[in-house]
């Protein structure tokens, strides 16, 4: 099942697989000399700009981060939100020792900026907006364990959720929910629109 792109002049017309987007990302770094941490900074800033535009009255933000680059984007959002005067808590999914590269760098920047970083144990009751930075476009198997619990908690919270790149639990190529998936109020997709956002379950996430 494929659903047409929304009729919006702001959306690009092409759709891409996760592998194609990863290749575009690699070429951007290698051919244009843009460092990976700079790309992550730009992605996080784009997501934070969207958060401010959609929820200008939001004051308390919960950022759920995973251990990959999606989580790294989340740390950028958290740092920018804190710098803007918002109350931010970062809730970690997965073992933080698995953080590498640019994601680890931005986790360290978050801590250096005075940010608090703790394991996920539920959505704080006073949260205004949730940022989903748990699972990215590389997901290929069903979500289980604490990840599934966190996704279910997001969906049950009644709070709007901004997904980074793709809602956690959604297959970026097929649009199939991998057991559990975040139902986001909005998704900020980087580099190119992922095919899975417009196929199968994608439009409902």
Pin down the residues of each PLM region:
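A cross-family phosphate/adenosyl-ligand binding-site feature
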Residues: 2-130, 135, 139-145
């Amino acid at each position: 099942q494929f659903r047409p792109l929304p009729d919006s002049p702001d959306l690009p017309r092409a759709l891409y697989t996760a592998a194609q987007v990863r290749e575009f990302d690699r070429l951007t770094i290698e051919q244009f000399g843009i460092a990976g941490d700079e790309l992550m900074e730009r992605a996080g800033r784009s997501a934070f700009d969207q958060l401010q535009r959609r929820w200008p009255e939001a004051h308390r933000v919960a950022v759920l981060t995973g251990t990959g680059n999606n989580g790294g984007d989340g740390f950028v959002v958290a740092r920018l939100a804190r710098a803007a005067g918002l109350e931010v808590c970062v809730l970690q999914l997965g073992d933080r020792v698995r953080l590498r590269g640019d994601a680890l760098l931005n986790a360290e920047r978050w801590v250096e900026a005075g940010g608090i970083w703790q394991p996920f144990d539920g959505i704080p009751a006073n949260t205004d907006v949730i940022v989903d930075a748990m699972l990215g476009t590389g997901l290929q198997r069903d979500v289980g364990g604490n990840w599934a619990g966190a996704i279910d908690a997001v969906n049950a919270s009644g709070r709007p959720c901004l997904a980074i790149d793709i809602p956690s639990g959604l297959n970026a190529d097929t649009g199939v929910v991998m057991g559990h998936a975040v139902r986001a109020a909005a998704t900020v997709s980087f580099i190119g629109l992922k095919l899975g956002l417009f196929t199968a379950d994608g439009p409902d996430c």
